[in-house]
Amino acid sequence: MSKFWSPFVSGLVPYVPGEQPKLTRLVKLNTNENPYGPSPKAVEAMRAALTDDLRLYPDPNSDLLKHAVAGYYNVQPNQVFLGNGSDEVLAHIFHALFQHDAPLLFPDISYSFYPVYCGLYGIDYEMVALDEQFQIRAEDYARPNAGIIFPNPNAPTGCLLGLDAVEQIIKASPDSVVVVDEAYIDFGGETAITLVDRYPNLLVTQTLSKSRSLAGLRVGLAVGHPDLIEALERVKNSFNSYPLDRMANVGGAAAFEDREHFETTRNKVIESREALVEQLRGKGFDVLPSAANFIFARHPQHDAAALAAKLREQGVIVRHFKQQRIAQFLRISIGTPEQHQALLEGLSDI
């Protein structure tokens, strides 16, 4: 601890991102990146934007991308908020909407950035336990709160909460903001964006990192009632008025316009996921039902941490979490058939 730090800094427990190895020969199945490239139209749009105009600031409102998102989801532009990745969007949400007297609620097994934001902004929170099957129970959230947030599909489990249950949670807390974090929704679920016109307390976040294959671009979004969006805009413009650069604006807009590439690559990921689930079950793994671009699996006869270490020795990286309830699980990102073959061969050698 430095004498120059503000007092609260020493108490922060930062988020630990998944490993980004420098060795390119490794089979990387640990950070849920899309194994297939982004839309060629998005790449071309970004190349076309590489002009002398880079000397100028980007559009602070990101109107091009905002209108593309609004058109895709059939909402109004003033219902859309954009940020430098969904993590920044979530950070603004915690800052703008969750600082109240009652606790924020989120699952005990979910995105590990949530308690980090609470620590950063001094937000009181309670973690709500998943059931024995690692599912969210909507009725558990019908209690006093100052807000609710949960990933759907959940991360790192991959389990999906049906839209009826999502709506049940929203209805039970009409005076609190309910945030549905849909980073992985395109791989097997139905978006709650269809509900935002019905519920002024609903905010839905998404990212272009997963199903749009643009993790390196850092584009996140939120869709909700204009009152909620205005709060986020106020925080954003008190922090960074230019979160999205010129490449992100044009590339993101083009990605939303290229529906054919999106559908093709998404379906390939889903097909690969289902095939890998069956292959792992054939090797004795228990695999949770997944609606994401990853699976959550455990082997009853092998320690998960040891498995992850042995796979790494063979050039395959998967994600292991030390949290008690899930310490015997591995999260495995969906890759190409060739990457899956390397994983399966590595497991056969263990």
Curated annotation (Swiss-Prot):
Keyword Transmembrane tagged: no
Positions where N6-(pyridoxal phosphate)lysine occurs in the chain: 210
Catalyzed chemical reaction(s): L-histidinol phosphate + 2-oxoglutarate = 3-(imidazol-4-yl)-2-oxopropyl phosphate + L-glutamate
GO terms, molecular function: histidinol-phosphate transaminase activity; pyridoxal phosphate binding
Pathway(s): Amino-acid biosynthesis; L-histidine biosynthesis; L-histidine from 5-phospho-alpha-D-ribose 1-diphosphate: step 7/9
Keywords per UniProt: Amino-acid biosynthesis, Aminotransferase, Histidine biosynthesis, Pyridoxal phosphate, Transferase
EC code: 2.6.1.9
Broad enzyme group: transferase
GO biological process: L-histidine biosynthetic process
Stored PROSITE patterns: AA_TRANSFER_CLASS_2
CC cofactor: pyridoxal 5'-phosphate
Top-level taxonomic group: Bacteria
UniProt-listed InterPro entries: Aminotrans_II_pyridoxalP_BS, Aminotransferase_I/II_large, HisP_aminotrans, PyrdxlP-dep_Trfase, PyrdxlP-dep_Trfase_major, PyrdxlP-dep_Trfase_small
Similarity comment text for this entry: Belongs to the class-II pyridoxal-phosphate-dependent aminotransferase family. Histidinol-phosphate aminotransferase subfamily.
HAMAP family: HisC_aminotrans_2
Subunit structure: Homodimer.
Protein name: Histidinol-phosphate aminotransferase
Classification lineage: Bacteria, Pseudomonadati, Pseudomonadota, Gammaproteobacteria, Pseudomonadales
